[in-house]
Amino acid sequence: MKLNERSLAFYATCDAPVDNAGFLYKRGGRGTGSHRRWFVLRGNILFYFEAEGSREPLGVILLEGCTVELVDAREEFAFAVRFAGGRSRPYVLAADSQAALEGWVKALSRASFHYLRLVVRELEQQLAAMREGSPANALPANPSPVLTQRPKENGWVVWSTLPEQPSVAPQRPPPLPPRRRASAANGPLASFAQLHARYGLEVQALRDQWRGGQAGLASLEVPWHPGSAETQTQDQPALRGHSGCKVLHVFRSVEWPVCNPGSQGT
């Protein structure tokens, strides 16, 4: 069998999940001692590296047409991978513990396609027995999801694998609340001219009220003429404040007092 070395090296160190990985002791050929190697199982291929972080594998074992069995060896927790045919030498491996031994034997025994074919055959027999035993609940010969074509959405046809549900009449939405209408006692809606005249009267009344207030403030004004304070007091009586100051002129809300020093005591 011809294999691409680059493809195997990439497959051995890629980021895909592995079926099993760990350190095993591998016995060399011609009765040499064992070496501790890092083994990685991916599918039906067993890679072994010099160390855990090595970038290239030292070797590869294709797990097809082989059996995994326990052996008596110098190493504890030893097992062997044997191939059919007298020319193929077995691979004797040893784990660090009993749990690791059981895990490796189970994983290697289930790695070949031969094991998968046996599993598929067993499942087919169980399925046939279930169909014969319960005809009422028999499964269809070729179960396939029902594809229901749906209308196009955004130019693409949407397919659904779910079974069709019984059609149910859609529930009507709750009725909308009635609109507010003008009562019959109020008569027809007023026109724009009527509204303009009605609110115009109110605006005019407010303007007249404001003008009346302005006229009342203007009556409190005292005209001021240039001259001395004595001349001003002779023409008109002066208004006195709480401190005896004479008020010469009143500007609606602002007063300009001139205090008489002689009137502080009065």
UniProtKB/Swiss-Prot annotation:
Domain (PH) ranges: 17-113
Keyword Phosphoprotein in annotation: yes
Residue numbers spanned by region Disordered: 165-184
Top-level taxonomic group: Eukaryota
A Gene Ontology BP annotation from the UniProt entry: endosome organization
Cited CDD domains: PH_Ses (cd13288)
GO CC annotation: clathrin-coated vesicle; cytosol; early endosome; recycling endosome; trans-Golgi network
Location(s) in or outside the cell: Early endosome; Recycling endosome; Golgi apparatus, trans-Golgi network; Cytoplasmic vesicle, Clathrin-coated vesicle
Coiled-coil ranges (or none): none
A GO MF term: protein homodimerization activity
Modified residues (Phosphoserine): 183
Gene3D superfamilies with a match to the protein in the record: Pleckstrin-homology domain (PH domain)/Phosphotyrosine-binding domain (PTB)
Keywords (A to Z) from UniProt: Cytoplasmic vesicle, Endosome, Golgi apparatus, Phosphoprotein
Keyword Phosphoprotein: yes
Motif F&H per record, residues: 191-203
UniProt similarity note: Belongs to the sesquipedalian family.
Other comments on record: Was named after 'sesquipedalian', an unnecessarily long description of a simple thing.
Main function: Plays a role in endocytic trafficking. Required for receptor recycling from endosomes, both to the trans-Golgi network and the plasma membrane.
Domain notes from UniProt: The F&H motif, an approximately 12-13 amino-acid sequence centered around Phe and His residues, is essential for binding to OCRL and INPP5B.
Assembly notes: Forms homodimers and heterodimers with PHETA2. Interacts with OCRL and INPP5B. Interaction with OCRL may be important for endosomal morphology and function.
Name the UniProt record assigns to this protein: Sesquipedalian-1
Upper taxonomic lineage: Eukaryota, Metazoa, Chordata, Craniata, Vertebrata
Gene from which the chain derives: Pheta1
